[in-house]
A protein has these predicted regions:
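Cap/lid segment of the alpha/beta-hydrolase catalytic domain
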Residues: 404-513, 519, 560-562
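Conserved SGNH/GDSL esterase-like catalytic core that processes O-acyl groups on lipids
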Residues: 27-30, 36-128
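Alpha-helical cap/lid subdomain in secreted, periplasmic
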Residues: 97-222, 234, 243
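C-terminal catalytic histidine-bearing segment of alpha/beta-hydrolase fold enzymes
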Residues: 584, 630-688
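Primarily recognizes the serine-hydrolase "nucleophile elbow" in alpha/beta-hydrolase
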Residues: 504-566, 589-590
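N-terminal pre-domain segments of enzymes
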Residues: 278-343
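Conserved catalytic region of serine esterases and O-acyltransferases that act on ester linkages
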Residues: 25, 216-281, 287
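Mobile cap/lid helix-loop segments that gate and shape the active-site cleft of serine hydrolases
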Residues: 549-600, 625-646
Length: 688
């Protein structure tokens, strides 16, 4: 196998086998198998981990066509019969003539995967006892606690000739054998699984794009490679691979929809590693031409008519503030609750609070950090763990930003005294491990926020709902089910409403149990699903003084009727846990919606509202996000507030600060960056 390079220059000189990587919190993965393992390791996997903010070293030990018995025999003999490769800081280097013992000693491996070719992996007799012997060998030579994972291979493509006759030239039959055998021996030997075979079959069965997945018996370099990398990433880290499809866009797979398809199939494979998931929707495949690829052409936006926020359901015009606040506002809230997000409960009896940590010298003395448990009732079974940073030295209660985080409180800052979830929480959320401390600190520029005199408050989304399609069994939802209830009713709350409900519980604490933050000067803020949450929380709870949405897209600030980028169908196919079941009626049927997202923005009136978009985030429909502000403007004008200074969508980096309305279009992709925060802080200086 030829020497390869992924990203940087190849390392040609190294002491011993290779220079060991010295990266804090690095995950070290060693794949033992044949060229298939090497294919996965040396293509997109390293870049996928790095894009997710997870430093990684990837090694692979290759012996062509070896079954487990031969691998075990070679290991026991110490014969230097393997090719050993390693990816460090993006560089791939290889060396022939290495023993398995040498490779195992080269790094303190966190994960070791085991793999053999599919034709052998389909039959139990080719696995036992060789696999058991190999497992014992590896466990004796690796640190205690190393994770052993079975690398589930994929069925061959139809044009393959390798061992193909034995399976009747039917890759579905071959997959069933692979899945059944892998289920049995992972159970027998207590191995975790990297279910690449299931990912590949998900792609084949759901999208009928064989040439984009495999060629003969090998993965191709487009969707197949991307999907395999997504599978390894989610299986090893426990983080949702779908969250990186905007951020990681290699030139081999520039089409966003295909990246999303690949990551989605990987995600469902990790949820059901031994069972194919068919993700076809409606009459065609999700993302196929039959179902409709996302539209990114403004000339193809269909003609549509928006519902008027200032017209009652019975057609009566709204002409006064009293009429808006006394009648129409309640109508719109009812429609959003019933048809889109679902109804949330009121606060529960017995809600109370407990400060469990205080650090008066956080962020180098800039702030006092606290952790507060917001218990939902007297039982103390369920709670939000709120983390707060309040600037030191103020002579008044601080204004604040409340932002739900998606990766755990510890991901916000490098401070190792920030609490991690306990073992039971990790189990409930189906997570194998959280990001490193401060891994996503660029999303939360605490020093900038604190220096401007603002407090920053945050909680982890999965304190309310774990954000995967679990049938609402692991979050707050079953905690309030009625006797005999096992699932929300069609108009009851789903994930986004649970997150917004959590924001209101934080506001309860701000009003009732503390004095360092001004509860009358708190803005919700959020990115992506957090942006949807920020708008919905502020729309329902008028105690929030301002709302800021960053790249919130479909179901957030973007007009649904435009069908630009992500649509109602696509968001509910990918994230069915976010919306109430009644919202399913509007898949491919947006014109029947009794509301649209400009009315969500209008519900925040007369309070300040800001929408941030990204020019490269066409999936979120940045123009549609801007138009929600434009079409919410009449409600603000009812209060004598002028809103945006123009109805013309601005160029990138030309922020619009109007009268209690703001908007900007940032260069770049789906993220919340320093440029965004500068605009939000400037806007808050004027209006919060």
């Amino acid at each position: 196998m030829k020497h390869k390079s992924l990203i940087l220059a190849v390392i040609l000189l190294f002491p011993g086998l290779f220079a060991a990587a010295q990266v804090k919190d690095t995950v070290r993965i060693l794949a033992i198998g044949n060229e298939w393992s090497a294919d996965v390791c040396t293509r997109d996997t390293y870049a996928y981990f790095e894009t997710g903010g997870q430093p990684v070293v990837i090694g692979y030990v290759v012996k062509t066509d070896a079954d487990y018995a031969e691998l075990a025999a070679l290991a026991k003999s110490g014969e230097p019969a393997f090719l050993y490769g390693k990816v460090v800081r993006g560089d791939t280097s290889e060396r022939e003539g290495v023993s398995l013992a040498q490779a195992l000693k080269d790094e303190r491996w966190d994960v070791v995967s085991l793999q053999t070719q599919s034709a052998q992996a389909c039959r139990w007799e080719t696995i036992d006892p060789g696999l058991g012997q190999l497992i014992k060998y590896v466990r004796r030579r690796t640190p205690k606690g190393v994770r052993l994972m079975y690398f589930q291979t994929w069925p061959y493509a139809h044009q393959s000739t390798m061992h193909w006759m034995a399976f009747g030239h039917n890759n579905r039959d071959m997959y069933r054998l692979l899945a059944d055998v892998s289920r049995k021996f992972t159970d027998k030997y207590g191995l975790e699984v990297i279910p690449i075979g299931t990912t590949v079959e998900n792609l084949r069965s759901s999208f009928s794009m064989e040439g984009d997945v495999t060629f003969a018996d090998r993965l191709n370099c487009t969707m197949g490679s991307y999907a395999a990398a997504a599978t390894v990433y989610e299986a090893v880290t426990g983080r949702d691979a779908r969250e990186l499809t905007d951020a990681y866009a290699p030139y081999t797979l520039e089409n966003h929809v295909r990246r999303e398809m690949a990551a989605k199939c990987a995600h469902f494979a990790c949820l059901q590693p031994f069972e194919m998931t068919n993700m076809k929707t409606g009459t065609g495949s999700y993302g196929s031409e039959e179902a409709g690829l996302p539209n990114y052409d403004e000339t193809k936006v269909p003609a549509y008519t928006l519902p008027d926020p200032l017209v009652m359901n019975d057609g009566t015009p709204v002409t006064s503030i009293a009429q808006w606040e006394g009648e129409r506002r309640a109508e719109l809230l009812e429609l959003f609750r019933r048809e889109v997000y679902g109804r949330s409960p009121e606060r529960l009896e017995g809600q109370h609070y407990k400060v469990v940590l205080t650090d008066e010298n956080a962020i180098g003395g800039m702030a006092t950090r606290q952790e507060i448990l917001i218990y939902f009732d007297a039982s103390e079974e369920k709670y939000i763990r709120l983390v707060t940073w309040v600037p030191n030295g103020l002579d008044h209660p601080a204004p604040a930003f409340l932002m739900m985080n998606t990766s755990g409180n510890a991901s916000i800052n490098e401070d190792h005294s920030i609490s991690y979830p306990d073992e039971q929480q990790l189990k409930n959320y189906v997570i194998h491990g959280f990001p490193a401390y401060g891994q996503y600190r660029h999303f939360y520029p605490l020093e900038m926020i604190l220096a401007r005199g603002y407090a920053f408050l945050s909680f982890y989304k999965s304190d309310l709902d774990p954000d995967f399609d679990d049938g609402f069994q692991n979050g707050v939802h079953p905690y309030i089910y009625k006797e005999g209830q096992t699932f929300p009713e069609p108009d009851q709350w789903a994930g986004l409403s649970a997150y917004a409900w959590g924001c209101s519980r934080v506001m309860d604490w701000l009003e009732e149990a503390q004095t360092s933050v001004d509860p009358h000067r708190v803005s919700t803020i959020g990115h992506s699903r957090g942006g949807k949450t920020a708008l919905w929380a502020a729309a329902q709870d008028t105690r929030f003084a301002m709302a800021i949405s960053n790249d919130s897209g479909c179901g957030g600030a973007a007009i649904s009727r435009r069908r630009y980028g992500q649509t109602v169908r696509q968001i509910q196919t990918t994230f069915p846990q976010w919306f109430c079941r009644n919202f399913l009626k509007y898949m491919d049927n947006e014109d029947a919606l009794p509301v649209d997202q400009h009315e969500l923005v209008a519900l925040i009136a007369p309070r300040p509202v800001y929408v941030g978009s990204a020019a490269g985030d066409m999936w979120a429909d940045p123009k549609g996000e801007f138009l929600s502000l434009v079409h919410a403007k009449p409600v603000y004008e009812l209060y004598g507030i002028h809103g945006l200074p123009t109805d013309v969508w601005p160029d990138a980096r030309q922020p619009l600060f109007g009268d209690r309305m703001g908007y900007h279009l940032r260069l770049g992709k789906h993220a919340i960056l320093g440029y965004d925060w500068v605009q939000y802080l400037d806007f808050a200086d004027k209006f919060l």
